[in-house]
Every structure is written in structure tokens, then in C-alpha cells.
Amino acid sequence: MRCRSLPAGLISLAVMALLPAADLGLSRAQARPTTPIPGATAQGLPARIPVPSRQEGRRIVINGREQTARWQWLPSVGGNPSQLWLPLEVLQGQLGVASSPRVDGSLDLEWFGRKQLVPSSEQRSLDDEVAVEASPLLQAAGVRLQAEGDRLLLEMPLPGLLRVRASPPGADRQVVLDLDGAALVRQESGQILLGLLSTASQRSELQALGVAVSASREGLLLRPRGGGRVLTLGGPDRVVFAIPPGSGAGGTTASSPAAPPLDPRLQALLNRTVQLDRQVLPVGSRRMLISSVRFDPQQSPLDLRLLTRPDGMQGLTSLTALAQQEQALVAINGGFFNRVRRLPLGALKAEGRWLSGPILNRGAVGWQPGGLPSFGRLALQEQLIDERGQSWPLSSLNSGYVQRGLARYTADWGSGYQALSGNESGVLIRGGVVLQRLNGAQLQRGIPLGNEDTLVVGRSGVIPPWSETSRLTLSSQSSDPVGQQAYVMGGGPLLLQAGRVVLNGTAEGFSSAFQGQGAPRTVIGSDGRQIWLLTLQGVDHAGPTLGETAAVLRQLGLREALNLDGGSSTGLFVGNTQTVRGRGVAASIHNGLGLVPRSGRAQGDRAGG
């Protein structure tokens, strides 16, 4: 709930060598308006009678493809919106807008060289999604905007593909597509949809570079090996993506490929040790679509695993990428995260190692391989003790939840740390000894983190008190036995314990608006014998409330259950395909849960069975 394109600063030298010198004949204006031009009309649309009141809805149609997403339109003279508020996920995932957060909480948006700065004061919530006022950026790129009742229509003309270029073969080989205008860029399940017009010869050029290609009425569908990372540039408009070494000739078809077949390893387990189910159940006067996967961890050759990116806690990816990375046969999205900063907001523990600590005493699930999970509300109580025996409490571990106090970061955060707030200070610790004191300027530039390093950061006037060479001892204790398990995932609110509804979102720091809204849901639970992975979606409505979710889970026979991230993040991956998309699209997420074959145990029966 809570981009896909790389920030321009990360473009490789190989790409820079490909970029043309400034050409006034090709360059397009890189507009950076802060308000719409007075009296202007959306391109190609007739002027409309101004409507003084706000319009809003829950459906967005982008070049004919519809999804569920909240929007708000504040119209002005001529039909151009004085403000158009859209979820950040829609801009990133469905259009290809790149975003980069600043320390002060503001957000830099960039799309084909068109830029927009969004201060933190101009970011708001639409239901459970972070939203920004996007009309300047969209209009600068020529997107046509129109509201029709509950639907918002975004129409983007398909530009032409002018030229295909590539850097020499190597570890960082890049492909550059020169366009005659900005294009829709959508990444999903390892594929890239580019809303552009291409010729057969251009598709053959891409095929020769090792990129599988297909054409459709929506544009060009690319399937670069490794999934591809996409960058958009302006002046002139370009799309850049990487292809891995050794890519041979790719295939090309006239239309989009069919969905991949069910993984034969999963097929062999169905109705034996793994059960899949999809049903519609009534909850009061409303109906819910429930998709579930359940298995007995003591009898199945599958293990429940945490799914995270291999490069640390900073960044988002797709559920499909997380599942395929660990060869998971089934996967669901996991815990909460900050979509603006792309950082975790809850407990993550794997193989006994804390990757990110819990926050706000929220609900969590913990388990040992081959066993049923336990559920509870969890806090991590950590402190540093100096040589005099004085203790100093730590507020968080490897977390995107920024608050006053001392926060701890390790190499599990990533290869380095860069300040998340203003006026930070810190100390770098190695082997229990303070090596270096760090000021705010150093932290804003970034500090590398080695495997043996611990960085303690002070925020909001709290300054780490230790001098260099001071010796410190870490004390760490979980508030609940859940935290002592080898694997832990945080979510919330906790829904069921011992068959009773224990829902208390206020105690876990959730807002009243969050607690009362209906939305797609993702849940992990247990009936005392099997582990359940579930998604719940509304039939002709936004989705179940948390109370309705708890009720329907009891109806299904679950005794323990934890709500995970939901809304657009809700997703279920089954045997090569993401079968559930919370609001109609496969949104980027931070982490997940997967069912992964044990070594040598993926062919149906346990040894001797």
C-alpha cells in the first residue's frame, strides 16, 4: 500500500557514452510548472464548464486499462484541474515516474526529464495510499485528463520509437530507445510495457540484443532477462534499461504471451500437502472473494520463508521478483513499508537475525522451520551499556520508522546509511568499541556499513554521548516469545488468538481512518494444524474492514491470524503467476512470505512417503 525507474544520478558511464549531444531540433521543453497555465485546456479536450466542488472516485483508466485507485480532482476554468491528487503507486508503477525522497521529507518526481518537487506538506493520504498533486507533471508530458463520474481517464498518445541503440557487450550493457515523445512505462512481473509505436524491424533489433518482444494495441512489451531496470530521460525523450551479460537472441511474437503454466513442482503437491482454494463468502450483507493456500508444515516438503531483496532494507520490488529469487512456489506480500522512502515499517527476522526491528508493539508472527507459527504483539527492547554500567535505550533497529531517540543500524540495512531526517548525529561502533563520532553533514553524505559495524544515530536533539574508544555492550530482548523464533514478520493489527477476536488497532498505533476503511487484505493465519496464506477482496465494493476480516477468518476455522499490508500491495503468487492483484495491478512492495521447497524435497512426497 504504501519506482521503478532509476534516478538520473545512477545512470552508468556506458549509457552516458550513448547519449547524444544537445540537439535543439530534437529537444523537448523540460517543463517544471508549479501550477497549471491559467486558461489552458487539456490537450485535445474541449473546454468544460467549471465545477466548483471537488470530484473524486475509485477507478482510474490509463490508456484503456482500468484499476481500482482513489483519486481527487479540483477543477478550474477550461477543464484543466487546478489540483489532481493521485496515489504515488499509480504514478510509479503504472506510468514510470521516478521518485527520490529528500531528508526533509519532500519528494523529487521525474518523468522523461520533466520534474516536480513535492514538499512533505503537499503529500496526503487517499485511503491507505500516499498521494501527491500530479497535474503539473502529467500536463507537461501531454497526458489528457478527464473525469467521468467515478472514473478518471488518463490518455497518453503513443509516441513513435525513433531508434534502438545499445552499448558494447559487457557487465553493464544498456539499451537506449529514442522516442518522439514521453511514453507510459509500466513494469509488472518481470515485463516492461512501453506505450509506443514500433516497427517490425525495430522489434527485430531488440530481439537480436536478447530481449524478448511482443507488440499489442497498448504498445511494446519487453521481457529482458533479469527483469530489467528502467530509466526515463528527457531532451530528447528516451527509455534506458539494462540487459545481463550473455543475453542471446530473444523471441518475438505478434501479441502478448499467454500466462505461464503452473509450476510442475506445485502441481505435484496439490491436494496432497498443499491446498488451494478460491471462494466467495457472505459477511453480513456484503460478499468477499477469498483466495487461500494452506499446508501442514510438518508434512509438506515446503518451508515458510521470509522474502526480501538481497541488497538490504532500502528499496521496493515486485512480489513475482521476490518469489522467483527464492524459487518460492507460492508467495504473498508481507509487512508494511514507507512508499515514499521505500523502507520497512515492522519486524523482519530471518535465520535468527534481525533485518528490521518491530515498531509500536504491533502484531507479529514467528516460526521455526517445519513448525506452526505463533502470534502476538511484539516490541524489541534494546539498550547500549557503557563501561560505568549506565544504559541507553535504543528506539529502533534498521527501521524506516523515524522518531526521537537513538536508532541502531547494521549492514543488514544495506551497504551504507544516509540520513533520514535533519540534524542527525551518530557514532560508528565496531567490536564493541566506538571508532568514530559523526556529524550531520557526514550522515547526509552517507556512511558505509561493514559486516561488523553498528551505527547509532541520534535524532531530534538526542546526541550519542560516547567518545571515541568507549566500550559498549548491547542488550537485546523481545517482549513476546514470538520474537524469539528464528523467523519473524511484523504486520498488524493482530486479528485472532486462540480462536478469539483480539482486534485492537488503536493499541498498535493504527489511525481510526485505517481501522474503519474497507480494503483488499492479506493475512497469515493458522487453524492449529495448517498454516494459511490468504487474500480477501470485496465483490463490488472496496474490500473488507478489519472487523469483517476477523469475522470471516473465524468462519473459515482459523484460530490465529495477523493482518499484513493490504490495499494495492495485496498479492498472491501461485506457481509462476501473480493470481491476485489487490487493486487490479501488481504494485511494488518491500517484502513477502513464500513457500519454498526444502532441498531435495520438492517432488511431491517426503522421503520414504
Regions found by a protein language model. Give the residues of each.
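Bacterial N-terminal signal peptides that target proteins for export
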Residues: 1-11
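Gly/Ser/Thr/Pro-rich low-complexity, intrinsically disordered segments
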Residues: 9, 13, 17-70, 74-83, ...
